[in-house]
Amino acid sequence: LYTPERNVWLANSLLEVQPSKEGKNLFSCSKKVNDYLKTTVMGDTLKILLDYPLDQLPQEFKKSKFMGMNIGDMRLDMAKDVGGIINDINSQNIGFKHLEKDSLSIATSNSIVVDSCDFAALQVIRSGGNVDFQSGTINNLYFKLGMMGNLSVNVEKCHIGTEYLTAQYANVQLQKGECERMIWIP
């Protein structure tokens, strides 16, 4: 939440994305934040909005210009037909675990961790924070390097076939053995 008078963010929050065991999308969060989430479905898109009324802030925070809310983690059990994740909740990182998908696009203003996932194609459109590939297989990885922070790949446990890289005004260090082939797209 941002207004000229106040900047509110989620402190230490993680959106954990994992495969759905029931074949449908399920979203869960802590009870204390559930009353302030508004969800709407627009076509094939689930939009989740954190709407905390600033007039209900505890008295000790009413004069604070900056405030981190500690609301706990959120989880999305994702069905196979989901093609993209967009998350712009300020300071909420995303962790992907045990996903097996043909393709997925990710856009976030925060950090991403990919662990034990298999993708035929993964596109990181934007990540304002770090991108950390811990383990898994990605046949084709598409990056816009200028739209992300640091990139890290555990070369012992994460196998990347081809990286398709594009950037403007980017400074990202690529690791030796990070992928089999790298294609630069100016």
Please name every model-derived segment:
Residues L1-D44:
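Start-of-domain marker
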Residues R6-Q18, I71-P186:
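Extended, compositionally simple hydrophobic/Ser/Thr-rich segments
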Residues L26-I71, D81:
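Membrane-embedded segments
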